Structures are given as C-alpha cells and as structure tokens.
A protein has these predicted regions:
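A short helix-coil junction within the Rossmann-fold of NAD(P)-dependent oxidoreductases
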Residues: 1-11
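Residue(s) in the substrate-gating loop at a strand-loop-helix junction
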Residues: 17
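Short C-terminal tail/terminal secondary-structure segment
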Residues: 21-22, 98, 109-110, 121-134
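Active-site loop immediately N-terminal to the catalytic Tyr-X3-Lys motif
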Residues: 22-28, 50-51, 97, 115
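Active-site helix of classical SDR
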Residues: 33, 41
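Short, flexible catalytic-loop segment of classical short-chain dehydrogenase/reductase
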Residues: 38, 60-70, 74, 78
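Short, small/polar-rich loop/turn modules that mediate ligand/substrate recognition or access, typified
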Residues: 49, 54, 120-122
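A conserved structural motif in NAD(P)-dependent oxidoreductases
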Residues: 79-82, 94-105
Length: 134
C-alpha cells in the first residue's frame, strides 16, 4: 500500500458476487469466498480509510457472455430441456428480468474511482438487476 498512500485519489475495487450476499445452494465454497470478500472489503476500508484510500466491492449478478451461456447450455442438456427454458427460469429470479453486462460492472467501477465516488468506501454494491434468488 505505500504507492496507494502516496496517491491522492487512491481507490481499491474488489470483485465479489451477489452470491456472497444471497448464498447459493450447491455452491457453498463459491458463495463462502464471495462472502469473505465482502468482509475483507469492509475491514480493509476501515484500515486504509485514515490514509485516504477508499475500498469498495462490486457484486455482479448474472453477467451475459460465453461463460453463463455455457452454464445455461450444460444445465439444459442435463435436464433435457431447451436452452431458452433454463435462461428464462434463471431470469425469473431477477426483478429486472435481464442479465447485466461486463460494461455495467465496469461503469460502476469507474464511478467509484471518480470524483463523484470520493465519499464512498466500505460498501459492497450489487450490479445485478436485483437478483432475488440463485
């Protein structure tokens, strides 16, 4: 942290997951490590705050792209149902009924590092369209 302490607008952005806040059946190790990242973020913010370093975490939800498409496809094949059925079932657990993009997550990171985010620290911010259940 010596370089960060010498930087006037230092900001650390950790990446966790909405699974760290909600829990995730059959994915205990994943959800546990994401929960730990939330606690790490809050603790580090308290430790580094007096030096002017802000620390926050982003909690992405279901991020569109090849990875989640593969997950949906594998689940569809194992259940013997169409891909669209799996996708729709998952998105029914999201209030906004859509996935987020990597760009959505990046835009929040940029905001947190900007002048507009100068007083935000120790926060875990969901970028998820309000995932209700995983």
């Amino acid at each position: 942290t010596p370089l960060l302490k010498n930087s006037p607008k230092a900001s650390i952005i950790n990446i966790s997951s909405v699974a760290g806040r909600l829990g995730f059946a059959r994915r205990l190790p994943y959800a546990s490590t994401k929960w730990a990242m939330i606690g790490f973020t809050e603790s580090l913010a308290k430790e580094l705050g007096p030096s002017g370093i802000r620390v926050n975490a982003l909690l992405p939800g279901i991020v569109e792209g090849p990875r989640i498409e593969g997950v949906f496809q594998a689940r569809a094949e194992s259940e013997g149902v169409p891909y669209e059925e799996v996708r729709d079932r998952v998105l029914n657990n999201v209030s906004m009924k859509r996935m987020v993009s990597a760009g959505d997550v990046a835009e929040m990171a940029v905001f947190l590092c900007s002048e507009a985010g100068k007083n935000i620290s120790g926060q875990s911010i969901s970028v998820c369209g309000n995932v209700e259940n995983l």
